[in-house]
Amino acid sequence: MLIYLFEWLSHYFKGLEVFSSYISVRIIMISITSLLITLALGRPMISWLQKMQIGQIVRDDGPQSHFSKRNTPTMGGVLILSSVIISCLLWGDLTSIYLWILILVVIFFGAIGFFDDYLKLVLKHPKGLRAKYKFALQSIFSIVLAIVLFYLLSKNGQMSLSIPFSKSLYIPIGIVIFVVLAFFIINGSSNAVNLTDGLDGLAIVPVVLVAAGLGIYAYIETNSTLANYLLFNYLGNPGLAEVAVFCAAVCGSGLAFLWFNSHPAEVFMGDVGSLTLGAVLGVIAVMVRQELIFFIMGLLFVVEALSVMLQVGSYKLRNGKRIFRMAPIHHHFELKGWPETKVVIRFWIISLILFLIGLAAIKVR
């Protein structure tokens, strides 16, 4: 919205055209805007959640240190999502279909997460939205979206899978493989981030790092000069560069949310935030054709999800025997005696290392 205003004003005031003509400037501005919006609205929202008594539910079989988290305001993810949408409407190119798709993903998965949180925290339904209904909604949306993206992104009905650390190795894939891959990436990422969001600040920092990494890839691949220099396939689809702008909005809002979510957390994002942010990262990875880079950068999320699947499988197949003391795996380390802050910071370090490995693939090819 603002780019059109600055484009008009640039006819009368020299220099303002940088705000409409340069995507790098808009990336900086949208990250600052989303950060400031989240910081400004954070305190009022926390107060409102406290007033409405929308607080965290703590498992009785969890670490004793978690009992102090009971009734901590939850559903703070609404703050992140609202900030991202507002910032995108202000600084995004509203002619980009990819920007609108990402906003639609935020709204749809945000609605699922919001309804799930509302059932658990307000209506006091212990399990919230039933898993089968949640999975069905996620699946239908992901499949439809994958089909749409295939026809938007494909060339002559063909797509390719980029292989990290390789200059020219691309695996051609058709619509069936693409849809199946996108389905697992979007749904898997959504639920993996949701499982990771179990300690103060644990999930939001890896989310910001992965969003930043994918944003860098989006910027490179949609810039013909950079793409050619770094030997990437140039993605010249009109409007696809707005993915980098969207990623910047997620980074800005996520960093500001950490201000309130760091230990001791004043607010949790809830399912409305974690389910949505995970889905958004998955969709972005599919859009910029960097699914394997996403796997590398987001490996922490994968490990968290795998720990739950292994725990459940072991319990069912081995007559109640468990692999971990508690799943997801961050709780296992807590029950081993690691302080919560140590678990979180060590997981952040791992996430940072994975982020750097993912960035190294830009040049080490």
Curated annotation (Swiss-Prot):
List the cysteine pairs that form cystine.
none
Name the cofactor(s). Answer: Mg(2+)
Q: Which domain of life is it from?
A: Bacteria
Segments traversing the membrane: 22-42, 74-94, 95-115, 133-153, 168-188, 201-221, 240-260, 267-287, 292-312, 342-362
Question: Reaction catalysed?
Answer: UDP-N-acetyl-alpha-D-muramoyl-L-alanyl-gamma-D-glutamyl-meso-2,6-diaminopimeloyl-D-alanyl-D-alanine + di-trans,octa-cis-undecaprenyl phosphate = di-trans,octa-cis-undecaprenyl diphospho-N-acetyl-alpha-D-muramoyl-L-alanyl-D-glutamyl-meso-2,6-diaminopimeloyl-D-alanyl-D-alanine + UMP
The UniProt keyword set, sorted, is: Cell cycle, Cell division, Cell inner membrane, Cell membrane, Cell shape, Cell wall biogenesis/degradation, Magnesium, Membrane, Metal-binding, Peptidoglycan synthesis, Transferase, Transmembrane, Transmembrane helix
Q: Specify the pathway.
A: Cell wall biogenesis; peptidoglycan biosynthesis
Q: Name one GO cellular component term.
A: plasma membrane
What is the annotated role of this protein in its UniProt record?
Catalyzes the initial step of the lipid cycle reactions in the biosynthesis of the cell wall peptidoglycan: transfers peptidoglycan precursor phospho-MurNAc-pentapeptide from UDP-MurNAc-pentapeptide onto the lipid carrier undecaprenyl phosphate, yielding undecaprenyl-pyrophosphoryl-MurNAc-pentapeptide, known as lipid I.
Q: What is this protein called?
A: Phospho-N-acetylmuramoyl-pentapeptide-transferase
To which species is this protein native? Francisella tularensis subsp. tularensis (strain SCHU S4 / Schu 4)
User: What lineage is this protein's organism placed in?
Assistant: Bacteria, Pseudomonadati, Pseudomonadota, Gammaproteobacteria, Thiotrichales
